[in-house]
Amino acid sequence: MPAFEAAVHLGADMVELDLRRTRDGVIVVLHDPTLLRLWGIDRTVGDLDLAQIREIGEGDVRVPTLREVLDQFTIPLMVDFTGDEVVEGALDAVREADATDRSLFVSGHVGALRALRALSPEARIGLTWIERRSPPPSLLCELGAEFWNPYFRLATSARVAAVHDLGIKVSTWTVDEPRHMARVAKAGVDAIVSNRIAQLRRFLSPPESARR
C-alpha cells in the first residue's frame, strides 16, 4: 500500500499492479512470484492461504488483496497478470468494487486475455508485447484491445502509427531514463509506464522557463 500512496502523491495518472492467487483462491497484489525478496520466505503466494499471508509483514508492509486496493484507491489501475489462474477472481473483485471503467487489464499471455474477454465483453484490455515482430492486427482486434503495451525499445514510430491506424492506443514500459522518455514520446505513444514518476512528470510538463 505505501507504494501506491507514494505514486498517487507524486501525481501518477494510473498505478500498475501485479496479481497472485492464494491457495484458497483469493486474488492478492504482489510483484514478486515468491515472498523471498521482501520477507525471506521461500514460498509462492499459491503455497499459502490468505490467513497465512495475513500473518506476514507488519504495519502497512503487507500483501493486500486486490479488493482492498480497489476500495482504498480511486486512481485508475493497470492490472497485470501472468496467467489465467487469476482472471476470474480479478474480474469478480473489479466488478464488486464497481471499478470496471478504471481498470485496464494487461498481460502478455494471450490465452489469459482471451479467457478474460470471454467472461467480460466490457473489460478494458491491453496486450503486453516483448517480441521483435509487430503485433498481428488480427490478434489486437480479436481481443478488442484498447492498448498495445510493448517494451519501450519496441515502440518505434512506425509500429505506433500502425497500431494507431487500428484505433488502438499505445502504452510502453518501463521507461526510467530521460533519453528513453524523449524517444518514446517522439514515437507518439499515448502512455508511459515508469518507476520515476516525478522525473516523468517534469519531462512531460517542463516549467515555462524551460520551454522558451
Task: Annotate each predicted stretch with a short phrase.
Residues M1-R212:
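Phosphate-group recognition and catalysis centered on beta-loop-alpha active-site segments
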